């Protein structure tokens, strides 16, 4: 093989690797990780004793992850013109021209279709339909209808983001119980303070993109107060699993400790604001949800 052919082959491999990475980025893997984590926790909590069926867990995890990735790709496609105007998102594949809209749409369709097929045939139809509804809720209701029109986009659109544990629960039981809805309620209450912390230190970005996020429409002080109020609501909601005897003392201790930590962040964000601390609060909120759901799982298998 000539030196020229070797170099061409190497360049082709690099180009293929870059394209694969671009498709991977479309799925918003960090967000997807949290989605899948909460769904898997829902699967384990749904089984009163023992462990869920491993085949169901694997199939449901793959199906939910694929559809979540497809929803993220559709979000990137629909908001490509907005992403190009924002510092936080201008380096995504579509604004950079690494992928074309048509191939992004094809990728989302294949990924989502595969995920729904897996859920229908190897999990159960209820989980498939709930996952499809979640996809529509995020990619259409939130992205197209709510986000560009109302500062309450996060509050209303948070319903789709709160669905993962419900999907996991339905995957192993074939039904949606009151306990599953409690898990939904926790994420639903968590979503506004989580995203508004981000919106506070990225408010100039959102204003430049023309998106009516709360700091843009109502100002930073009102948004900081809203973060504090919703964090108080979240604290109360996280006590419900113990109050309903879904979880025990171990979870209660963890929920109270984590809740106090989140409240301290929210109070400081309100009383002594800085962009750096808003970023810190945003990051803490992600860790908070991971640890809270981990506490639910620990309490489930290690009851005191």
Swiss-Prot record:
It catalyses: heme b + (2E,6E)-farnesyl diphosphate + H2O = Fe(II)-heme o + diphosphate. Converts heme B (protoheme IX) to heme O by substitution of the vinyl group on carbon 2 of heme B porphyrin ring with a hydroxyethyl farnesyl side group. It is found in: Cell inner membrane. Pathway: Porphyrin-containing compound metabolism; heme O biosynthesis; heme O from protoheme: step 1/1. Pfam families: UbiA. It comes from the Bacteria. Carbon 2 of the heme B porphyrin ring is defined according to the Fischer nomenclature. Coiled coil: none annotated. GO terms for molecular function: protoheme IX farnesyltransferase activity. It comes from Aromatoleum aromaticum (strain DSM 19018 / LMG 30748 / EbN1) (Azoarcus sp. (strain EbN1)). Belongs to the UbiA prenyltransferase family. Protoheme IX farnesyltransferase subfamily. Its EC number is 2.5.1.141. GO terms for cellular component: plasma membrane. This is Protoheme IX farnesyltransferase. The gene is ctaB. The keyword Membrane applies. It is a multi-pass membrane protein. The chain crosses the membrane at residues 31-51, 58-78, 99-119, 126-146, 154-174, 180-200, 222-242, 243-263, 284-304. Gene3D superfamilies: UbiA prenyltransferase. GO terms for biological process: heme O biosynthetic process. Keywords: Cell inner membrane, Cell membrane, Heme biosynthesis, Membrane, Transferase, Transmembrane, Transmembrane helix. The keyword Electron transport does not apply.
């Amino acid at each position: 093989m000539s030196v020229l052919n070797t170099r061409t082959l190497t360049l082709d491999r690099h180009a293929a690797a870059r394209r694969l990475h671009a498709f991977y980025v479309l799925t918003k893997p960090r967000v997807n990780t949290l989605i899948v984590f909460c769904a898997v926790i829902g699967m384990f909590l749904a089984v009163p004793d023992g462990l869920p069926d491993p085949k169901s867990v694997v199939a449901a995890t793959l199906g939910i992850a694929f559809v979540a990735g497809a929803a993220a790709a559709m979000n990137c496609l629909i908001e490509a013109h907005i992403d190009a105007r924002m510092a936080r998102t201008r380096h995504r594949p579509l604004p950079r021209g690494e992928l074309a809209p048509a191939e992004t749409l094809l990728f989302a369709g294949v990924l989502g279709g595969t995920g729904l097929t897996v859920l229908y045939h190897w999990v159960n139809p209820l989980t498939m339909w709930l996952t499809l509804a979640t996809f529509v809720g995020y990619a259409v209701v939130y992205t197209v209808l709510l986000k560009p029109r109302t500062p309450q986009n996060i509050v209303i659109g948070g319903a789709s983001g709160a669905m993962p544990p419900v999907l996991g629960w339905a995957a192993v039981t074939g039904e949606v119980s009151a306990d599953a809805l409690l898990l939904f309620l926790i994420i639903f209450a968590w979503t506004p303070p989580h995203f508004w912390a981000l919106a506070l230190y990225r408010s100039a970005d959102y204003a430049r993109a023309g998106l009516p996020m709360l700091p843009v429409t109502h100002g930073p002080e009102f948004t900081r107060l809203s973060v504090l109020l919703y964090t108080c609501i979240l604290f109360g909601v996280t006590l419900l699993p113990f109050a309903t005897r879904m979880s025990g003392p171990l979870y209660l201790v963890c929920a109270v400790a984590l809740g106090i930590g989140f409240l301290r962040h929210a109070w400081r964000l309100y009383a002594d604001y800085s962009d750096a601390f808003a970023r810190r609060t945003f990051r803490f909120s992600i860790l908070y949800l991971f640890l809270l759901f981990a506490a639910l799982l620990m309490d489930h298998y290690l009851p005191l």
